[in-house]
Structure formats: structure tokens, C-alpha cells
Amino acid sequence: MTKVITRFAPSPTGMLHVGNIRAALLNWLYAKKHNGQFILRFDDTDLERSKQEYKDAIEEDLKFLNINWDQTFNQLSRLSRYDEIKNLLLDKKRLYACYETPEELELKRKFQLSKGLPPIYDRASLNLTEEQAKKYIEQGRKPHYRFLVNHELINWHDMIKGEVKYDGKALSDPIVIRADGSMTYMLCSVIDDIDYDITHIIRGEDHVSNTAIQIQMFEALNTTPPTFGHLSLIINKDEKISKRVGGFEIATLRKEVGIEAMAIASFFSLLGSSAQILPYKSMEKLANQFEISSFSKSPTIYQPEDLERLNHKLLISLDFDTVKERLKEINAEYIDENFWLSVSPNLQKLRDVKDWWEICHQTPNVENLNLDKEYLKQAAELLPKGEITKDSWSIWTKEITNITGRKGKELFLPLRLALTARESGPEITGVLPLIDREEIIKRLTSA
């Protein structure tokens, strides 16, 4: 059986976002599920927009998610190989020179659209005589090159979409070499996939027409195309998610929002599939259950609050030995197991534990909370004597009810606000023993 080799090929022109991290995850998981290899390739032929800082950020995000790669390379290191294939395809008459300026091409596109026609290149340059081409060159025009798509039926079996058919007549011959001599994604990608023995490619369904063209490129180079799988798009309300829309970056989720790596990995590798989205604790366990056939053909809605809920489920499922290592990473190694167990059931983000440590160890500011001072002073007098334990809260509140007649929110909320300055949070039953007795009385009497 052929060894499975997948790849993730980001362009270092922006940050990783929830749309393309999904492709990275699924390619990695598919490779690991089948004991294969995963390759990281940087499509950096866009010299103007590609930046080292984006490449570094992409690698940082992948490492954060424990997406490790067996090989990595960038397309700029393979230009001589691309030139070799360019000459081969020119000899085969599958590439042809074009001399239209961007402005002329835009005029053609607008004209076609005004007539209700699809903006497909009209192949005007395909039939240029040598004399006409020479005239353009004398005018100072530099040619760009297009791949000649055969006008025939293109079909393949897609891992997600099933049987896919494309009419070659509906496809525009793509530009594969720009006028400045640089290569575009389309052909370089095929050459790389051939040379690195890529067997499976999982990517967004916005690449379906690219796949149809690239299948002809593989065949023009006498190579069997890889197996393709096209994921339905992730949408947020009414727009698809892409880096051009902005937001939803992985770096933002981990640095600013505070989502755990395995919450991100679990969520986006299961989103859009028939599998239940659960908080897996390791990439290996996630890979073991992974099934590419479980993914839907329909668009998938991404709601950030669902990710945050999964993050909460992951946090409360972690054993303290695992938590200890994560606490070190956020400079909160002073948190002990007792404190963690007391506050973790209500944590949405790991970093929230630092806030609760501060709440328990530093008197909160309650000046603007309009608290009932007489009630709180009365409650302070009724605080059980001796050591504060997890039983103290129920004993205390029963006594308050007996003396004041208060119940429910009227009883609990003023106490919570005076003690924590928060309307919600971990159960006060567990929080109360974390605050020194003298501090409890101070907070109640000075509110």
C-alpha cells in the first residue's frame, strides 16, 4: 500500500485563521491516522506580499497546536525546478505566452460580465502570429504565460463531495507565470506535489475549480493526481471566513482570547462532521477517532461561543498534573491543587484562575456596587466561629435566613458582591475557605 503523505501549504501573506487551520489539522490527522507523513510547504512566490514575520507566526501557531511536520520547504527555493517544468510544458504546447496588460484584461472581464457571460479568458493570445508577438515585445510588453486547459470533461472522486465533474470549457486558462517572471500558485503546487509524492490533499471547497485545472496539469506531466477532499466553507453569520475578511486569527484565539490548544484542535477538526465535538486531551487521541468521510458537504457555521464552551469543558476535565504545567506557562505556578479544584468548575479560560487568586488574596474594590452595609455587618456577626471550611457557607446562610428572613438572591448576591466584587463565578462554598477569616470580616464590614 502506498504511504500516505499529506501537506499544508499556507501562503505567508497573513496570519493563520480558523478557515485554513482546519485544513492544516485535517491533513495532519489524516496522515497520522494512516501512519503517514505530513509536509509543511510555504507558497511564497508572491514576493510583494510574502513576509518572514508571517512565516514565523504560522510556524508558531502550528507548534502551539502540536501540529508537527516531517519536512518543510518554501517554493522560492525551487525556482530552477519550476523553470525546468515550464520549458517542458512549453514544448508540449500546454503553456502559451500572452501580452495583454492588466487594464486590457479588466476591460475584457467587464465586457463579458455586462453581456451576462462568465469572465473566461478568450484565448486571444493563443493565435498570435510571430510578427504580432514581436510587435508587442518591441512595445516593451513582457509576456505572462497561461496553462492551456483542454475543453473536455474533468472528473474525480472526492473524499468528501463524492463524484465531482467539471466541464473544461467552463474554466479559464490560468496565469501560471507572471509578466515579471515569477510563478503563481497553480503550477508550482502541482510540481511540488509530484516531487514530494503527495498522496492526499484536503482543502476548502473554494479550491474545487483549481483542482479541476490542476488535475489536467498532473496529467500533462504524466502523473496520477493525488486524492482530493474539499471541505465545506466555515461561515460566521452571512460571510465566509478568510484572512481577507480579518479577525478569527489563531494567534488572537490563543493570546488574547485565551483558548487552549486542544480546545482549538478538537473544535476545528470536528466542526462540520457528524462526530460529536468533544474536548480531546491529545492529538493522538484525536487522530485515532478521525474519519474524513464524516464531513458534511454543507457550509458549517462557526460560533465563537461554542469554542469557548468547549474550552471550559476541556479545562474542567484536566487532571492537576497537566494543569500544573500549563500554569507554569502563564506564570501562575503558585496556584495549588486545592485552589484549582475550588475555582476551576466555573473557569472559561485558564488565565481566569489568576484573577480569582487575586480576588481571594487582595481586597476587591466594591465602592461603586451600592451594597446594603447594615445587612453585610449583620452577616459578619453571624459568620461561624473557628476555621472556615466548605461547610461554613451552608451553616452561615442558614443562620442568616433564621435571623434576617432573607432567602435566595436577596441573601446570596450581596455576600458574593462584597466578598468577590463579582455577580457570578465559582461556588462561594468553595471560594469562602480560600479567603482568610479576618479578610472575610474586613470585606463585609468595610463594604
Swiss-Prot record:
User: What domain of life does the UniProt record list for this protein's source?
Assistant: Bacteria
Entry GO CC: cytoplasm
Q: Where are the transmembrane segments?
A: none
Q: Which UniProt keywords apply?
A: Aminoacyl-tRNA synthetase, ATP-binding, Cytoplasm, Ligase, Nucleotide-binding, Protein biosynthesis
Under catalytic activity, the entry for this protein gives: tRNA(Glu) + L-glutamate + ATP = L-glutamyl-tRNA(Glu) + AMP + diphosphate
List GO BP terms, alphabetically.
glutamyl-tRNA aminoacylation
Q: Where in the cell is it found?
A: Cytoplasm
Give the residue ranges of motif 'HIGH' region: 10-20
Q: What is the documented function of this protein?
A: Catalyzes the attachment of glutamate to tRNA(Glu) in a two-step reaction: glutamate is first activated by ATP to form Glu-AMP and then transferred to the acceptor end of tRNA(Glu).
- Family affiliation: Belongs to the class-I aminoacyl-tRNA synthetase family. Glutamate--tRNA ligase type 1 subfamily.
Protein name stated in the entry: Glutamate--tRNA ligase 1
- Name the gene: gltX1
